[in-house]
């Protein structure tokens, strides 16, 4: 199955996972989100009480137009080789305690372990916040491999 949506302002179509009604909810940009495969359990992350939205590691995300987010506009002269301009005014952040951050889109892909931390479990001092509630560990931190209750540690 192929899910069409956009991330960082660019349309993408990914065949990762499967499309189904089990991921539909108002905070998603589409009613059916990409679901993780058996080896990609960290691709989707719970939002609010139920269901989930897809993470950048799935090459599929949700718009997260509503819910907890940060306002503002971030522009980039060039993204990759396309030279396109990306402007995002709202993104998903389940933990409202981490506010006022401004990071480049898609920063998750540059992390050693993109699914190491999630903001509502991990310590803010240990994790670098990113889009859609997922965060990357800072160089001096290491988190549990699972996303159930990741905890930052001083060393790996």
From Swiss-Prot:
Record keywords, A-Z: Acetylation, Keratin, Repeat
Sequence repeats: 26-35, 36-45, 46-55, 56-65
Residues where N-acetylalanine is found: 1
Short name of any one Pfam family annotated for the protein: Keratin_B2
Superkingdom to which the source organism belongs: Eukaryota
GO CC list: cytosol; keratin filament
Function (record text): The keratin products of mammalian epidermal derivatives such as wool and hair consist of microfibrils embedded in a rigid matrix of other proteins. The matrix proteins include the high-sulfur and high-tyrosine keratins, having molecular weights of 6-20 kDa, whereas the microfibrils contain the larger, low-sulfur keratins (40-56 kDa).
Further information: The source of this keratin is lincoln wool.
Protein name: Keratin, high-sulfur matrix protein, B2B
Organism: Ovis aries
């Amino acid at each position: 199955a192929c899910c069409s949506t956009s991330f960082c302002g660019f349309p993408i179509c990914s065949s990762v996972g499967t499309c189904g009604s089990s991921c539909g909810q108002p905070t998603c940009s589409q009613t059916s989100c990409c679901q993780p495969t058996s080896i990609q359990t960290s691709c989707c992350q719970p939002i609010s009480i139920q269901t989930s939205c897809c993470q950048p590691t799935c090459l599929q995300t949700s718009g997260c137009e509503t819910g907890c987010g940060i306002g503002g506009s971030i522009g980039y002269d060039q993204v990759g080789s396309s030279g396109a301009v990306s402007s995002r005014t709202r993104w998903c952040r389940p933990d409202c305690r981490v506010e006022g951050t401004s990071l480049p889109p898609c920063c998750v892909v540059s992390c050693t372990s993109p699914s190491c931390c999630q903001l509502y479990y991990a310590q803010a001092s240990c994790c670098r916040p990113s889009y859609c509630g997922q965060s990357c560990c800072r160089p001096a931190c290491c988190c549990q491999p699972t996303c159930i209750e990741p905890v930052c540690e001083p060393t790996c």
